[in-house]
């Protein structure tokens, strides 16, 4: 039969890796704009800065960026309860409870809502 060369396998694997969700997580805003976005509620803004900002406001982290509708839409289609469950259990590079052990389910819903909305909806 056919012998597949290791170099060909490696090239195929690299091509597929370029199609991963994190590779399509291109920011719609500049880094400065992403870093400036905060929830209007001061308490929630503090939680966001402490638990979410590092990954969700920095391109290349693999996390859906704040305001990146294309990245958030498939996640939102799972429903809020499923998203909150994923946050609480951890997913991929996100640790359980998303570095917010004191967050309530309502806090997670508010944070998801903030991060998944376009900037003009804030």
Residue ranges and their predicted role:
Residues 57-85:
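Gly/Gly-Pro-rich "capping" loops immediately C-terminal to redox-active cysteine motifs
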């Amino acid at each position: 039969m056919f012998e597949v060369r290791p170099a060909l396998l490696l090239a195929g694997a690299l091509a597929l890796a370029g199609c991963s969700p994190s590779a399509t997580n291109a920011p719609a805003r500049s880094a400065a704009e992403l870093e400036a976005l905060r929830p209007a509620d001061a308490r929630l803004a503090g939680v966001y800065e402490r638990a979410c900002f590092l990954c969700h406001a920095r391109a290349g982290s693999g996390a859906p960026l704040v305001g990146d509708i294309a990245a958030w839409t498939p996640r939102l289609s799972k429903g809020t309860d499923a998203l909150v469950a994923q946050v609480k259990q951890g997913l991929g590079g996100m640790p359980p409870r998303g570095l917010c052990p004191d967050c309530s389910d309502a806090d997670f819903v508010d944070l998801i809502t903030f991060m998944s909305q376009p900037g003009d909806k804030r």
